[in-house]
Amino acid sequence: MSFQDLEAGTRSPAPNRFTGGRQQRPSSRGDPSQEVAAGIFRISTAVNSFFRLVNSIGTPKDTLELRDKLQKTRLQISELVKNTSAKLKEASEADLHGSASQIKKIADAKLAKDFQSVLKEFQKAQRLAAEREITYTPVVTKEIPTSYNAPELDTESLRISQQQALLLQSRRQEVVFLDNEITFNEAIIEEREQGIREIEDQIRDVNGMFKDLALMVNHQGNIVDDISSNLDNSHAATTQATVQLRKAAKTQRSNSSLTCLLILIFGIVLLIVIIVVLV
Amino acid sequence: MAIIFALVARGTVVLSEFSATSTNASSISKQILEKLPGNDSDSHMSYSQDRYIFHVKRTDGLTVLCMADETAGRNIPFAFLDDIHQRFVKTYGRAIHSAQAYSMNDEFSRVLSQQMEFYSNDPNADRMSRIKGEMSQVRNVMIENIDKVLDRGERLELLVDKTENMQGNTFRFRKQARRYRTIMWWRNVKLTIALILVLALVVYIAMAFVCHGPSLPSCFK
């Protein structure tokens, strides 16, 4: 679309302005701009192709051939960018020095802007390619050993088989060793479990003892309460008895006084009787 | 004693050994050293023979072996082997790799003897055994506590009986005290009445004399 507008813009003013020297002036002034436009178009196409290759990185299509193609495409785009940049500079110099028309200046500015946008896309594609190349490794196909010689192939296969045999043997030894270690650790764990179980039994016994002790202490608490109530009742009864005895003592003291008084009266009466009888 | 024989070797070369009793453990252990599987790889093994078990531990090319009772289990013998290995490496260091047979026996057999004694008899050698011992002590203390509480219960039974008797006695004492007070009161009443009668009689007799007759004729005329 933008290229169509560019071509329309470049072609439409040509026959109107340069009616006098048509053949000489359009060819000398139109070549850099047209070449820049063509270069930008090719760069854009190459960048799209580069993007397709970059999207294949990390998939089963990712092979060494793909990586080589990526590298070639990158170099091709760099070369195109270099050429187009030189032509763009040439066109801008012609615009500055020569008495170019306003429409042409605007067209060249637009070309420069398009060139910058294409460059940005290329840089983005390059950055993405770099990230993916670091993250993933290409799939090594089996076609590569076909380039070897027959004796080298035999030597390689023999070496590989020997390595596999040694690896298998060492793994078997490791398995035996691990089995021994597992047996040993299981025996240790079994013994530890038994010890812990015995401790658990002892703790359970102690728990039962504590419960029995609690029951007995609770029962004896009731007995102590009975003892306390008995003592309180005894104390109260003794206090009341003491009060009664105190009253009895007071009454007895009064009785003694009365008894003395009676004896005194009898004495006086007896004395009077004796006096009367003697007289 | 749980651990009876101990030995330290490099490969099949015996560097030091000690035996608590006279047995054929030395020859049997040599056979075991020759038959150990694996080439200088770290491992733990246990071989049984009659009533004894040979425990073998190999670490960094140094082999430690001990013969123990079946009742000793595995925790204590292997803890013993770990301890002996550390002490041996700490004491002799790099000399282990180039030592002659039995060259450390004079010095290290005493250490073997001490550690055999420690791991066989001291309950602190194993945390599990120590906890079992402590739980046994706790259980014994609880049994004593229960006995004391039972004894206290019996005494409390006697005490409650005695206090009930005392309560009955004090109730009876109170009743008798009240009765005694009543008796004293009545006696006081009787004496008062008697006194009044005697006084009345005396006054009557005196008036009889003064009025010249028992019927008091002159006083009421």
Curated annotation (Swiss-Prot), chain A:
Annotated InterPro entries: SNARE (IPR010989), Syntaxin (IPR045242), Syntaxin/epimorphin_CS (IPR006012), Syntaxin_N (IPR006011), T_SNARE_dom (IPR000727)
What transmembrane ranges does the database entry give?
Answer: 259-279
UniProt biased composition (Polar residues): 21-31
Chain positions found as N-acetylserine = 2
| Keywords assigned by UniProt, alphabetized | Acetylation, Coiled coil, Membrane, Protein transport, Transmembrane, Transmembrane helix, Transport
Which ranges make up the Cytoplasmic topological domains here?
A: 2-258
Topological relation to the membrane, as annotated = Single-pass type IV membrane protein
Top-rank taxon, per record: Eukaryota
* Region annotation Disordered: where it falls in the sequence: 1-34
A molecular function (GO) held by this record is:
SNAP receptor activity
Assembly, in brief, is:
Interacts with VTI11 and SYP51 to form a t-SNARE complex and with alpha-SNAP to form a 20S complex.
Supply the name of the protein.
Syntaxin-21
Q: Which organism is it from?
A: Arabidopsis thaliana
Swiss-Prot record, chain B:
Which Pfam families is this protein grouped with?
Answer: Longin, Synaptobrevin
Q: What is this protein called?
A: Vesicle-associated membrane protein 713
- Report the subcellular localization: Vacuole membrane; Prevacuolar compartment membrane
Membrane association type: Single-pass type IV membrane protein
Q: Name one GO biological process term.
A: response to salt stress
Share what the entry says about its subunit structure, partners included: Interacts with subunits of the vacuole protein sorting (HOPS) complex including VPS11, VCL1, VPS18, VPS33, VPS39 and VPS41.
Print the domain comment field.
The longin domain is critical for the vacuolar localization.
Keyword tags: Acetylation, Membrane, Protein transport, Transmembrane, Transmembrane helix, Transport, Vacuole
Q: Where are the transmembrane segments?
A: 191-211
Q: In which tissues is it expressed?
A: Highly expressed in stems and roots. Detected in flowers and leaves.
InterPro entries tied to this protein: Longin-like_dom_sf, Longin_dom, Synaptobrevin-like, Synaptobrevin-like_transport, V_SNARE_CC
Listed GO cellular component terms? Golgi apparatus; HOPS complex; plasma membrane; vacuolar membrane; vacuole
From which source organism is this entry? Arabidopsis thaliana (Mouse-ear cress)
Give the family, as the similarity comment puts it.
Answer: Belongs to the synaptobrevin family.
Q: What does this protein do?
A: Involved in the targeting and/or fusion of transport vesicles to their target membrane.
Which ranges of this chain reside in the Cytoplasmic compartment per its record?
2-190
Q: Does the keyword Secreted apply?
A: no
Q: Report the residues modified as N-acetylalanine.
A: 2
Q: Can you give the residue ranges of the Longin domain? A: 7-112
Q: Kindly report every residue range on the membrane side named Vesicular.
A: 212-221
The primary location reported for this protein is: membrane
Tell me the ranges covered by the v-SNARE coiled-coil homology domain, including all copies.
Answer: 127-187
